[in-house]
Amino acid sequence: MDTQRFQSQFHWHLSFKFSGAIAACLSLSLVGTGLANADDSLPSSNYAPPAGGTFFLLADSSFSSSEEAKVRLEAPGRDYRRYQMEEYGGVDVRLYRIPDPMAFLRQQKNLHRIVVQPQYLGDGLNNTLTWLWDNWYGKSRRVMQRTFSSQSRQNVTQALPELQLGNAIIKPSRYVQNNQFSPLKKYPLVKQFRYPLWQAKPFEPQQGVKLEGASSNFISPQPGNIYIPLGQQEPGLYLVEAMVGGYRATTVVFVSDTVALSKVSGKELLVWTAGKKQGEAKPGSEILWTDGLGVMTRGVTDDSGTLQLQHISPERSYILGKDAEGGVFVSENFFYESEIYNTRLYIFTDRPLYRAGDRVDVKVIGREFHDPLHSSPIVSAPAKLSVLDANGSLLQTVNVTLDARNGGQGSFRLPENAVAGGYELRLAYRNQVYSSSFRVANYIKPHFEIGLALAKKEFKTGEAVSGKLQLLYPDGEPVKNARVQLSLRAQQLSMVGNDLRYAGRFPVSLEGSETVSDASGHVALNLPAADKPSRYLLTVSASDGAAYRVTTTKEILIERGLAHYSLSTAAQYSNSGESVVFRYAALESSKQVPVTYEWLRLEDRTSHSGELPSGGKSFTVNFAKPGNYNLTLRDKDGLILAGLSHAVSGKGSTAHTGTVDIVADKTLYQPGETAKMLITFPEPIDEALLTLERDRVEQQSLLSHPANWLTLQRLNDTQYEARVPVSNSFAPNITFSVLYTRNGQYSFQNAGIKVAVPQLDIRVKTDKTHYQPGELVNVELTSSLKGKPVSAQLTVGVVDEMIYALQPEIAPNIGKFFYPLGRNNVRTSSSLSFISYDQALSSEPVAPGATNRSERRVKMLERPRREEVDTAAWMPSLTTDKQGKAYFTFLMPDSLTRWRITARGMNGDGLVGQGRAYLRSEKNLYMKWSMPTVYRVGDKPAAGLFIFSQQDNEPVALVTKFAGAEMRQTLTLHKGANYISLTQNIQQSGLLSAELQQNGQVQDSISTKLSFVDNSWPVEQQKNVMLGGGDNALMLPEQASNIRLQSSETPQEIFRNNLDALVDEPWGGVINTGSRLIPLSLAWRSLADHQSAAANDIRQMIQDNRLRLMQLAGPGARFTWWGEDGNGDAFLTAWAWYADWQASQAIGVTQQPEYWQHMLDSYAEQADNMPLLHRALVLAWAQEMNLPCKTLLKGLDEAIARRGTKTEDFSEEDTRDINDSLILDTPESPLADAVANVLTMTLLKKAQLKSTVMPQVQQYAWDKAANSNQPLAHTVVLLNSGGDATQTAAILSGLTAEQSTIERALAMNWLAKYMATMPPVVLPAPAGAWAKHKLTGGGEDWRWVGQGVPDILSFGDELSPQNVQVR
């Protein structure tokens, strides 16, 4: 009993006199107890209010007025919680009727879980008074016992036994479990009762329902899982309240003789109200469409029981309905857009698979769609194409301009160190992002193909599988004497839910798993028989003597294959007793001929067979019974050659219970035809709702009153035939739907009407089918529509067919992309499936399970070839003329293979098409080097090459030339690969050439440059000399190599020379990689044309080095020197981030601002232990990157002030070498501290902060930095005080190749803004073997390509004296 808040109402019914009497009795009993000092040992109450327990209460269906309403209660009946509830004795149930159901439902936030606040009473005084009365009575009797002696009491009870008390006063009190909740006053109470929870018969599944193999036996009847009957109720809305102890749950029960069937689409809702028992249309129902927060719209159903409401559909919405009899129903609708009409961009690449370093060509074609069939040109606008690698890292962005007519195209080159895997293209266009993909792998294409030819088209179980493998080179020649290894695995087939499933793969033992191909390239194949329908997976690995093997896997299906004949009829259904003509035709030339036909009726498995006329093409069958039939054609051996399903209508034909069968007479319709639909119900039906659906309910009709968009014919009690005229607006497809309800159940079925969409016919034709490498290929393209020529925009690619053997085409067919079969955008639901529930205790949320990802393996097939060209031609934009013609040419690459030409096109009306053709490149004799091209001095190369011959035992002559000497070898080649050793004695660098002659004609020729390098480690040196007209002595070391001349006459040329020297530095760790990115970014910014060949080269180098930095990153994007394990260094991490930021800014790779904030994470952790110079440099980079660093700058300034550097430290003479690194070697020296002080002054000035360092200390630091010989110190002083191009040139002249790359890169980057744009001075051509070379920075140099080391450098007399840098 709660005496504070929830007081029992019982005490208001007790009179004051009665209360006083209780108090007097209590006082007397206490007095008596004290006087008598009697033994008051009475049992304690042991009373506790029944707590009850958690349970579920739900209404899992609605009810009609003639049905007994009931709710389901689920209590825990198999554990300790049951005993906590059993004490209560059952469940208290109250049933209320809701007076205004629509207003009540509108007030609920969750219609599934009705919330009605309880009126809690607690346990009350009833059991308390019972215990007090029993206790007081017992104590008073004890007092009376002590009043008389024991002998007196015995004498009295012997005389009058009825006065004997016995054990009455020690018996426990009898308590009554009262309902702890008072009735709800707001709603009329219909009935209340206590239902025996644990004695009631538990809910159990229907007879015959059993789950085989269920160890938990969870569908067996469980105590506490019961239905509580509520009796038959009048139509309306009822509230059910169930209580066990202090636990209470509520739910609502819908009673209505009307069912609401709804179809919701993007902006519309169609509601059909029908009788729950007979399914007839019921008009006059009030409908409210709500999203759970408010009513969106409302209406009343018309005479046909339908109502259309217009509003944008939310993801979840509800229909609240009230029929004319007062019945209430609720339907829940879920909607999501499955078809969205907006801009469609078709993004595809020239091929699906690339190597690292390859060029990727991208084409974009687009249309703005307004519905499934109608579109308009896209809006011309700029777009940005982003490339993401397999790790999700953003590699680069490319600007693409999309044109309304021609679309857009772009290209980029993959980094040389690109990771393998799937890459994603993201195109940002008009605030939307579109995606495509391609793959990158380190592959070599197979140099011959392996084909499988089986002895039979179909194999049965128990039959040995025989056939042959055929090995062919790309030009069609057989692979002789190839070593072949076979491996076989088998998977049994089974059918589950009409889907083909495969069991595990198990190896099968083979006899003769290793064999050799014959002269025709054939390998006999004999596999063991399968005892059950199976799939054989045969792995073949073959080698023709080349360095790499070719591996492929072939699939063989046992008792499941493709048909040899097509079997068709005029319609896919007919009437019983009607003669049906079936026609058959061969799909391919075969000796197998059908001799018999057989049909099987699926309903009763009856069958019939008959013979086919010899040489016939058709046969006639008269089906006497309605039903579903399977027809098959068999040959003389009983092998199935063709199959077809056919439906027969007639009296007695029914669908399966709960379903509707719809059979269309054709699979594809042309506009103007009539689609015939056979509708079969499971029982006699008089009323249903027929609709055409796609983006909305396009048309609707009742079965009893057909609308004008269709005609209906009733064939029998359960079958109807609907005829729907097909219009152009149906394309590419539309859904025909049938919906009905009966006896409290509803069913619907959809059937698609597929309509042909006109497509462009694009044909590709070459002037011949076979070409030799280097020949000119002429291609003719033809575009037509319905047989008439039409102008169109085409994109054509010529790709090695072997690429598609490694990676099938990723881009979808252009016709299926722009005009796919649309998904039905209408969702159907009913008020019969709405469930309301309540739970006494909410469950704890469960953490979601972790995702499981697996990586896809990359195929690694090998193919030796001379020229690695995978895309022979790429024409992103070709236009056919009014006659539908276009032409282009390309040179056949130096590769022997089969090429695929793919042409995709679109005309001005948005109609698309795709065509394909094939051609071959072949050559009887061709050569390929089999030796490296770089050697060390002293090596003795074993020179050789491969000659691939398509002839056998034909004499040829091999002529090789090197260093002026010519060698001739007469050879007899066998078919295939022939290795030939060369007889030249090669000991020096030079050009090696080879020529293959036959009958005096040159059949093939190749050449390569061989280089010999010194064994010692090369050290780059440079010097500046003054050169003039005439001879100039160079005085170079004897072992000098890679000699280059560059003009250094102007500051701009000095800057370019240093930039090029940094770019040419060998990459390696984080320092060098970042030091290459800085000058590359400067070179990119200096270019006037970012689309030139030079720009593409610089972009490629930036991509390679950015990716190199990504690969060096450790955990948390922190860096060590070489990417090794360990905690990241804050300075190296900041340098890597800064270099990447410079490169990203240069080439337009955008990142979110918070992305760069990670640069300062490691600095914040390690700043206290870092040298002042390192700290100053990191904050200088951070300030340049616009990162928030004012607080960090204050901390650095305070650290410099606390350092307390002595004045004599600044006055010490700096004797270090100019090539010593201040940053890497002595970052804590006095000079380094001075440079940090000066740099910090500059940073504070930019941030508008005041320094706490004493002015005299700052002046000493400035003087020490200015008087040093370190270029970094001079650069920092120049940044602090300002400068010009002349001062910049003086600093840059002091940069040498021996200095650290980070200091040179920083000087270049910080001094770039002082360089004015001036044209470079042209250095004329020197006399001798000098070759001009274009440099990354925009300048040029002269490189020595002759033998030995030049002693003098000669120019014309007219050359005025110039400063020249020799490296």
From Swiss-Prot:
Keywords: Signal. Pfam families: A2M, A2M_BRD, MG2. Residues 1-38 form the signal peptide. SUPFAM superfamilies: Terpenoid cyclases/Protein prenyltransferases. GO terms for molecular function: endopeptidase inhibitor activity. The keyword Signal applies. InterPro entries: A2M_N_BRD, Ig-like_fold, Macroglobln_a2, MG2, Terpenoid_cyclase/PrenylTrfase, YfhM-like. The keyword Endoplasmic reticulum does not apply. Belongs to the protease inhibitor I39 (alpha-2-macroglobulin) family. Bacterial alpha-2-macroglobulin subfamily. This is Putative alpha-2-macroglobulin homolog. It comes from Escherichia coli (strain K12).
